[in-house]
Design a protein with these regions (language model features):
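Basic- and aromatic-enriched surface patches that contact anionic nucleotides/nucleic acids
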Residues: 1-133
Length: 133
């Protein structure tokens, strides 16, 4: 059964219950898009829907990438699920889910995302400024 909270979903990604169909394109978002997604989430803005397919049939899939390194080509290991495994395949929302997974549980180019949610406006920057370090 899918857990519909953010961290429940991220844990299911980490535990290989929510996976990407083999035909999905690679992750392409840059760190500014990831930061803007997190900023929207923190401000309570809608960030779009995710479409999952709960399949009991054998499917070819790949796991989410937790640590993104844009300096090397992305290489994927394609796996096959057993019939009845009940995997959830992401049909729409891969870029957003990967971004959330990287932001909260992984790294982007060997850096961890930090969000400045306590300071006020400084140098024309929006409060809640974000950066990778």
């Amino acid at each position: 059964m899918i857990e519909y909270t953010l961290f429940g979903l991220l844990n299911q990604i980490e535990n290989n219950q929510v996976v990407l169909p083999a035909m999905q394109r690679p992750f392409v978002w840059k760190e500014d898009r990831i930061s803007r997604l997190i900023d929207s989430l923190l401000r309570g803005f809608p960030i779009g829907a995710v479409m999952l397919w709960n399949t009991k049939t054998a499917q070819r899939y790949r796991r989410f990438t937790r640590d993104i390194d844009t300096t090397v080509p992305q290489v994927f290991t394609i796996e096959s699920s057993e019939p009845g495994a009940g995997k959830y395949l992401v049909l729409d929302g891969q870029q957003r889910l990967t971004s959330l997974y990287v932001a909260f549980k992984g790294t982007y180019n060997h850096r961890t995302l930090y969000l400045d949610v306590l300071s006020g406006d400084s140098n024309g920057k929006d409060p809640g400024g974000e950066y990778f370090e």
